[in-house]
């Protein structure tokens, strides 16, 4: 009945999604992603203060295990990124375009400490969007565990099941029999 009306991948993905919904099964899906010549945008592994309105981007947080999370960097919350590969970041620009196609490539970042008035440059290797998502996911899980610990006064443990698979099972099992076994 629907087949004559399906003439592109997007419509087929929609129909497949409807069928899977009728089956009421989990962990399934159909998606369509348009092909294109897009440039993947890399990440510096930083969270920014979106209330900051001056030149540059003010760092709000350095994400654990990201490009700036190392002993040799001076980047931390409050530091301003003024330039990426020599291009100044202005308040009206979309700075993300400066990171297009930069994942796994050395990138020069110019920084400024407004407290000490010091300026310096560091070379980092930005990560891909999917690598950033993994770091943010890990950050989220750790924050939930810290919340549960704080709210319960240390009486409860937080166990997160990432997926239905061996690695996730072993991680949960290790938490239950390890750090939460008292």
Model-derived features: positions:
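Extracellular/periplasmic catalytic domains that process cell-envelope and extracellular macromolecules
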Residues: 37-40, 50-53, 74-76, 102-103, ...
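PDZ/PDZ-like domain segments forming the peptide/carboxylate-binding groove
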Residues: 39-92, 166
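Solvent-exposed, acidic/flexible segments
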Residues: 5-16, 74-75, 88, 92, ...
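Extended, small/polar residue-biased N-terminal targeting/export presequences
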Residues: 2-54, 118-137, 141-142
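Cleft-lining beta-strand/loop regions that shape enzyme active-site pockets
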Residues: 60-61, 67, 82, 86-182
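Glycine-centered secondary-structure boundary/capping sites
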Residues: 17-24, 45, 74, 153-156, ...
């Amino acid at each position: 009945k629907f087949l004559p009306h399906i003439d592109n991948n997007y419509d087929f993905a929609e129909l497949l999604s409807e069928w899977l919904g009728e089956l009421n099964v989990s962990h399934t899906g159909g998606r369509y992603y348009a092909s294109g010549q897009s440039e993947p945008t890399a990440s510096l592994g930083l969270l920014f203060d979106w209330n900051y309105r001056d030149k540059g981007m003010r760092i709000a947080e350095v994400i654990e295990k990201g490009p700036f999370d190392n002993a040799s960097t001076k980047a931390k919350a409050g530091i301003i990124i003024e330039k990426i590969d020599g291009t100044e970041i202005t308040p009206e620009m979309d700075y993300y375009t400066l990171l297009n196609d930069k994942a796994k490539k050395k990138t020069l970042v110019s920084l400024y400490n407004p407290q000490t008035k010091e300026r310096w440059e560091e070379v980092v290797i930005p990560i891909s969007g999917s690598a950033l998502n993994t770091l943010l996911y890990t950050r989220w899980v750790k924050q939930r565990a810290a919340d549960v610990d704080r709210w319960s006064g240390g009486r409860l443990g937080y166990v997160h099941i990432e997926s239905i698979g061996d690695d996730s099972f072993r991680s949960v099992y290790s938490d239950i029999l390890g750090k939460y076994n008292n």
